[in-house]
Amino acid sequence: MFITFEGIDGSGKTTQSHLLTEYLSKIYGVNNVVLTREPGGTLLNEAVRDLLFQAKGLDSLSELLFFIAMRREHFMKVIKPSLMQKKIVVCDRFIDSTIAYQGYGQGIDCNLICQLNDLVVDMYPDITFVIDVDVHESLSRSCKNGYEFAELEFYYRVRNGFYSIVEKNPHRCHIITDNNEICDIDGINLIHLKIVKVLQMV
C-alpha cells in the first residue's frame, strides 16, 4: 500500500505521517513500513534538497525539473522496491504537492506536470490524506510571521489547488480538516484518529 500526505507548509502533514507510520508499524512490524519524503528520500536527493532550498533566483520551470528528476531517483530507489516487497510506504509529499505548488501556485501548466510525472513513475498513491488548515494558521506555524501579501496569495492558490486535486481524485484523496484541536482529553492526537478511521474504512 502506498500512502501519501499532502498539504500546505505548516499543515502538520509531517507530524501525521510519522504518527501513522508508528501506528502501522505496531500492527505490521517496523520492517514492513517505510517512511519517506519528497523532496528527498535518498542520500543524493537529500543533498540536492538542501541546495535547492538555499538557491536564489531559480526559475519555476528549473525547480520543477529538479523535483521531477528527484522523484525518479526516489521512486526507483525507495518507493517501488518497497512496494514490490509488499511493504507499506508512507510518503510526506508526492505528485500532488508538485501540482499544487508548481502548477496552481506558480502557474506552470498542470497537464505538463502530469506528463512529466508519468515519464518518471508508473503508479499513483493508493490513499492520499490532504491535511487542510487555514493559511494564516499554517504560516504562523511555519514561523513566517513577517509574510507579505504576495506570499499569502501564493498559499491561497496552493490550498485551492489541493481542493481541486481532491475533487478530481475522490477515489484516493481524503481531506482531513485541522480545526486547531490538536489533542483530546487523553492526549490522543485528534487528526491522527480521523486518519486512522478513514484508513480502516478503505
UniProtKB/Swiss-Prot annotation:
Question: Domain of life here?
Answer: Bacteria
- GO-annotated molecular function: ATP binding; dTMP kinase activity
CDD domains in the record, alphabetically? TMPK
Which residues belong to the signal peptide in this entry? none
Which chemical reaction does it catalyze?
dTMP + ATP = dTDP + ADP
- Extract the InterPro entries matched here: P-loop_NTPase, Thymidylate_kin-like_dom, Thymidylate_kin_CS, Thymidylate_kinase
- Which GO biological process annotations does it have? dTDP biosynthetic process; dTTP biosynthetic process; dUDP biosynthetic process
Enumerate the SUPFAM superfamilies for this protein.
P-loop containing nucleoside triphosphate hydrolases
Q: Under which EC number(s) is this enzyme classified?
A: 2.7.4.9
Could you tell me the keywords of this UniProt record? Answer: ATP-binding, Kinase, Nucleotide biosynthesis, Nucleotide-binding, Transferase
Q: Name one GO cellular component term.
A: cytosol
Instruction: Detail which positions bind ATP.
Output: G7, I8, D9, G10, S11, G12, K13, T14
Q: Name one Pfam family in it.
A: Thymidylate_kin
Give the record's family classification.
Answer: Belongs to the thymidylate kinase family.
Role, per record: Phosphorylation of dTMP to form dTDP in both de novo and salvage pathways of dTTP synthesis.
Q: Cite the NCBIfam families for this sequence.
A: DTMP_kinase
Q: What is this protein called?
A: Thymidylate kinase
This protein's encoding gene = tmk
